[in-house]
Design a protein with these regions (language model features):
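C-terminal structural segment of proteins
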Residues: 4-198
Length: 198
């Protein structure tokens, strides 16, 4: 995996970004939006966890170190990515080597005529103690026409699901504002990538 505009120009593997369990990891929200599976391998073989179950609490993931488990793969099911386009926005104080103040990932599958939201998924980093989806926002647009009015309603609905914190990086109110704005921008860009017209 190589970042472009998200951080530094170093090449890296994705496991370190997930195994540390922090909600601010750049890959965390995107892997949640794509409904990824985590493959864990240990002395007793392999097991697979949905990414939403992998993150237990802030800074803690479900790896059994006593059994020598390590993360060996991230899998994204074909049904999650087929005919689907997505976009990620990271908000931080700097352009490089920065921990996200908020990270938002949206992906969309449009109807064949590109006029209806067939499926929309949105996930956040730094909107709660673990990366999280915003199912209320998803429900607002799934099955609905691709319109700016629906995109605006989608972006406002994220506030029903997220619970950002106050910190020295940003206040809860500011993080909430960024979450709404990034939801809107991510969905607009995802629609464009999927061939939709606004």
């Amino acid at each position: 995996v190589r970042s472009r505009g998200l951080g530094d120009v170093y090449k890296r593997q994705i496991g370190g970004n997930t195994c540390n369990g922090v909600t601010s990891a750049d890959s965390a929200s995107t892997l949640h939006a794509w409904e990824a599976l985590v493959e864990l391998t240990g002395v007793n073989g392999k097991r697979y966890l949905p990414i939403k179950d992998f993150y237990i609490k802030a800074g803690t993931v479900d790896i059994n170190v006593a059994e020598g488990e390590i993360q060996t793969a991230i899998l994204i099911p074909k049904a999650s990515w087929e005919n689907t386009k997505g976009f990620y926005i990271k908000y931080g104080m700097r352009n490089a080597m920065e921990i996200a103040t908020t990270g938002c990932s949206v992906n969309v599958r449009l109807s064949a005529d590109k006029k209806t939201f067939d499926r929309v998924r949105i996930a956040y980093g730094v909107a709660g103690p673990v990366p999280m989806r915003a199912p209320s926002a998803e429900a607002v647009v799934n099955g609905q026409p691709v319109t700016m009015e629906n995109i605006e309603a989608f972006s406002r609905a994220v506030l029903e699901d997220i619970n950002p914190r106050d910190s020295w990086r940003a206040s809860k109110a500011f993080r909430s504002h960024i979450a709404v704005e990034s939801a809107k921008r991510c969905l607009i860009e995802s629609v464009k990538l999927a061939g939709g017209v606004l």
